Amino acid sequence: NSPFRTRSVAENLELFQKMKDGEFKEGEHILRAKIDMTSPNMLLRDPIMYRVLYKKHHRTGNDWNIYPMYDWTHGESDYIEQISHSLCSLEFKPHRDLYNWFRDHVYEYGKEQFPTPPKQREFSRLNLSYTIMSKRKLMRLVEDGVVSGWDDPRMPTISGLRRRGYTPASIKSFIETVGVSKRENIIDVALLEFKIREDLNKTAKRVMGVLDPVKVVITNYPEDKEEVLDASYNDYEDGFGSRDVPFSRELYIEKEDFREEANKKFFRLKLGKEVRLKNAYIIKAESCTKDANGHITEIQCTYDPLSKSGSGTEESTRKVKGTLHWVSIKHAVKAEVRAYDRLFSDEAPDSHKDKDFMEFLNPTSLEVINAFLEPSLQTATIGERFQFQRLGYFAVDRDTTSDTLVFNKTVGLRDSWTSHKNKR
């Protein structure tokens, strides 16, 4: 016990006033709550309520020479502000006994002015896989330059999620699905990604962009000809409207959408086979050109001029198994696309007692891609969200300028990470 535990109330009040008046040095005196030094809960063993601290406060300046400890001010401020329930994470459960002691022994004197006594309740933290939620550890990522700031799209912060393209509705739906638990667990981030896919599938306009291009030349399409195609922003829902998409002899498609030879399960473009170009024509791959290293640099195709989508001809309704997105090379808009992956390669990077969580950083969590987009996206505004058809959902980043479009990849159309993990 403290040798001063039996000091009288009057003497304690006198010393406390001197603490307030700045008559003592820091550490010379403290005010403690007289509870129970034999309590099995260490927090109830006469905890400190106030200490002398000569620090300038950002609001009150140097008006105060004493400052309260957390456990005292926690319940005190809740009571003054008439907070009915103080919701805390599970590590604060031992603090509830002290919270209640202060309420029962001190707040009794203010019940007429403040009639509602507060209650502390605990629940488990929201822990997401492949990231960390500790503010202290997130700050280390910022200070060490691992991420660009608190709003880096890889950060599990509201500002980071917003910049990446997550909507309030998707986050709310995720939280409602997870619910409140008393048990510590790790929520698979794939659930959060499912929620944003679900939301953007209903709300995002569909457009076309090519991230990894290979050139296609339609050899029987006139060199001096250009067309403007009317393309719907959403083929499945009304009210989205449409935009003009230019079409010409030379196009870009994705490299992975072409194979010289492929099995029957490959429904994209291959030599001697047909595919439909979205909102345009059916084309057939006739030949391809390679560079000195054997990489395909150009695909020569022919098109069926009667197969134009929506033209009403018999050929336009002809069924082919594959449909590809594309952009006209002549009209394509260059853009920077930032593709994001998991920030960490370990499901629970801060759960290893013998290792620093920084050891599990994913070196490929950010890939910057020089992409080619359809020209309608030139008028896209910061924060606007789109589905790049067959690729995923993307949002216009605040780094966009009048000269350069910048998109952040919000999420792919499918959970490719889980599929990859299951194959290992």
Explain the meaning of each model-derived region.
Residues R103-V106, L141-G145, L161, I175:
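Hydrophobic alpha-helix position signal
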Residues R7-A10, V147-S148, R163-S173, V178-R424:
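Basic, alpha-helical terminal appendages of large translation-related enzymes
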Residues H74-I83, T116-K119, K137-L141, S148-M155, ...:
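Short acidic (Asp/Glu) and glycine-rich catalytic loops that position anionic groups and cofactors
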Residues E11-L15, L98, K137, T157, ...:
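Exposed alpha-helical structural elements
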Residues M155-L161:
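Active-site-adjacent structural elements in folded domains
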Residues N1-L138, I196, K205, V210-V214, ...:
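Active-site cores that bind ATP or allylic diphosphates and position pyrophosphate for catalysis
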Residues H85, S89, L161, K182:
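Short, flexible active-site loop motifs that bind/organize anionic cofactors or intermediates
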